[in-house]
């Protein structure tokens, strides 16, 4: 469908599209992946996709309907001589896939950067018990450096590793955002 895109671009678009279905119950992930692979390359009728994949058309329709609910596929109703009923031809809207993914990644980056600037720039205290919350210096002082939940002494938490992990995640998100923006530019 998008001849100017390379295999790597198509893989990114497939992964981004499939990420929109991550939380969907009742959708077979393998059918979803293979269905997206088909409509990434061409417009297709659900029955043709099902036949090509060797699966029940209802499974393919489930995937297509969920993607349609998210606004990333469109369809058009048509009549074909070989079918006795109207059929629906499905097409992936790559620009919308990219727009939604960019929006989500930017939001994630904003959250990570907020955590880096706020949470990670101030000392945090914890008792060591997984069930108990972390506290800021001010909160720890209010409780006289004792955990209000279990009564243990609060110790300063070393945030070095968490900070490093958040910085790595922020860099990964920036790289992914740049890649998606370049892809969007090429699609026009």
UniProtKB/Swiss-Prot annotation:
Keywords, alphabetical: DNA-binding, Transcription, Transcription regulation
Record domain HTH TFE/IIEalpha-type: where: 9-98
Which segment of the chain is annotated as a signal peptide?
none
Q: Which organism is it from?
A: Methanopyrus kandleri (strain AV19 / DSM 6324 / JCM 9639 / NBRC 100938)
Record gene name: tfe
Listed GO MF terms: DNA binding
Task: Share an example GO biological-process annotation for this protein.
Answer: regulation of DNA-templated transcription
**Organism's domain of life?**
Archaea
| UniProt-listed SMART domains | TFIIE
Phylogenetic placement of the source organism: Archaea, Methanobacteriati, Methanobacteriota, Methanomada group, Methanopyri
Assembly mode: Monomer. Interaction with RNA polymerase subunits RpoF and RpoE is necessary for Tfe stimulatory transcription activity. Able to interact with Tbp and RNA polymerase in the absence of DNA promoter. Interacts both with the preinitiation and elongation complexes.
Gene3D superfamilies in the record, alphabetically?
Winged helix-like DNA-binding domain superfamily/Winged helix DNA-binding domain (1.10.10.10)
In the record, the note on similarity to other proteins reads: Belongs to the TFE family.
Designated name of the protein: Transcription factor E
Q: Which HAMAP family does the entry mention?
A: TFE_arch
